[in-house]
Amino acid sequence: EEYILNKLKNYFQPRNSNKDTVTITNLTDYERISHNRFRGFLLNHSTIENEHQLSATSMMSKKIIREMQSDMEIEGYINSINVLLDDLRDNLKGTLPLSIKSFDLKQIIKLLSFKYDYSEDYARLITRLEQVVPIVVDEMNYQANEKAFIIYLYPEAGLSIKEQIRFRKILNDLSIPVIVLTESSCFLSKNFRGLNYFINNVQMITETFLEDSYWNAPINVEKEQIEERFEYLFVKYCSVLEIKPIISNYLLADIIVFNDIDLYILVSFLKHCNLEYKLDIDKTKISLALSSYLFS
């Protein structure tokens, strides 16, 4: 998955795009999407933490400089500082031909540092993320001329479940599209078309799967029901799909389902993905048609 996401990010770059070896197509009209349509950025918690260093290339530094440039009074302050520096140089004794570097906005950045009060919540990663991520993403979008999207890798790292929920809200509130690579259900999309599940670099959650599951269903079920229940079941059980889960309708197990529709959808998807599973089913609690599908 990370390989695919890197390809996606590298395609949508103004320079050094992989557009000559990668093609991205809009499935609505089957036209190729230009590499200039968006600008991709890759983020993780380490990237955000490194922003606190205020390096010359950091988004935080760029944003601070940009905001100072828009402040008319800043130029007057810098001119005053340079006059004082010239006076200081003139007061140096000796005849050496010394000069002094002009003070500018980049010099100000070098003098800045974060001074978090670690007796407060800033000692917690989630608080620093809440403070910095929106600022960094806002600057990314500005640099990309309002065409940015971000890929956030493993946003659950180092966060408790409650903190993951808080950070999910931060990502949801961003003004640009966000793609996450995650092992936590807290960050999964609640919409079928926002879910992704790859096996050997092949997307398994597709409209074709949805259509096939509908037409091949051994029970009476609407297509909308399949989509709705799949969204719920995938988010709930995605973490156990690849461990040969035990599926039961009457005992505690890796996957517990109590109705025919849920049982059919889960088994249909596992078969679609060629994933192994074990059934521990009370056949008296399911329809004969479903029983034939499961055990044939």
Per-range role (PLM):
Residues 1-2, 151-157, 181-184:
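Structural motif
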Residues 1-58, 271-296:
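Glycine-rich P-loop/Walker A and Walker A-like loops and their local beta1-loop-alpha1 context
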Residues 7, 138-139, 169-170:
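A generic secondary-structure signal
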Residues 63-130:
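Conserved P-loop NTPase mechanochemical-coupling segment
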Residues 110-163:
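Conserved helicase/translocase P-loop NTPase motor core
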Residues 146, 163, 169-239:
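The catalytic "switch" region of P-loop NTPases
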Residues 153, 168-169:
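Short, charged, amphipathic alpha-helix that recurs within catalytic cores of restriction-modification
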Residues 227-296:
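C-terminal alpha-helical "lid" subdomain
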